[in-house]
């Protein structure tokens, strides 16, 4: 769930798979960007096909900001030894829209509860470290149309308001169509400015 007071969020820079071995057990941490629980479920279902001989595919995801949607699974490992440690890594790095699946090939030596927690956490940490993180910004899409005689004035005004070339896409047809990406941070700053202006006006007394 999105919180309109939050204008940015952290997400994985790229999908990534990272592997390490602990007491002959092979752990593969996989980071994926997801936008919904359904998308996460579809990706999770593919891992037994990708690694058909693996013993476990444990996972956790966190989606949205504010009251984020969080779920995790131990996938057959002892309760609390896999899913929660993986989710803890996602939260510790302040990531969202993030799914991590840790695949395990059992190597014949039991790791114990503490060993499993440490191994699944380490696999998730390694994958996140290699994937990297990027700061993303929420924005709204806006479509403007005007005549050709007004297009230059509109372009000048938009740039004066802080819209860069990357956020402006102009199409020319019977009229001029301008598609904008409006960052929520820009909307909030303008709302705050209007609120301050309104308070100043209301607080002015004639003498």
Q: For each of these PLM feature ranges, what is it?
A:
Residues 134-150, 178-180:
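Short glycine-/aliphatic-rich beta-strand segments at the starts of folded cytosolic domains
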Residues 180, 185-189:
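Terminal, non-globular segments
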Residues 146-164, 188-191:
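Short amphipathic alpha-helix segments
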Residues 96-106:
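Glycine- and acidic-rich phosphate- and metal-coordinating loops
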Residues 1-80, 196-207:
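C-terminal regulatory domains involved in ligand/effector binding and gene-expression control
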Residues 79-91, 106, 116-120:
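Conserved mixed alpha/beta catalytic, RNA-binding, or beta-rich assembly cores of soluble enzyme
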Residues 11-16, 125-130, 154-167:
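Short amphipathic beta-strand starts and helix->beta connectors
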Residues 117-139:
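Long, charge-dense
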């Amino acid at each position: 769930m999105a919180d309109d007071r939050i204008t940015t969020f952290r997400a994985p820079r790229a999908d990534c798979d990272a592997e390490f071995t602990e007491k002959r057990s092979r752990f593969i941490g996989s980071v994926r960007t997801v936008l919904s629980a359904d998308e996460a479920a579809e990706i999770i279902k593919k891992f037994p096909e990708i690694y058909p001989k693996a013993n476990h595919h444990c996972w956790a995801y966190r989606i949205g900001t504010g009251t984020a949607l969080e779920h995790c699974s131990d996938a057959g490992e002892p309760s609390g030894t896999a899913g929660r440690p993986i989710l803890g890594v996602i939260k510790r790095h302040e990531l969202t829209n993030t799914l991590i699946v840790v695949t395990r090939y059992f190597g014949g030596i039991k790791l114990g509860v503490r060993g499993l927690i440490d191994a699944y956490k380490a696999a998730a940490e390694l994958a996140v470290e290699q994937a990297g993180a990027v700061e993303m910004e929420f924005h709204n899409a806006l479509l403007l149309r005007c005549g050709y005689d007004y297009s230059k004035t509109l372009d000048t005004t938009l740039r004066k308001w802080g819209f860069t070339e990357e956020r402006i896409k102009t199409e020319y047809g019977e009229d001029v169509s301008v598609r904008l990406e409006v960052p929520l941070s820009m909307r909030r700053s303008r709302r705050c400015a209007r609120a301050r202006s309104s308070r100043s006006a209301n607080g002015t007394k004639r003498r």
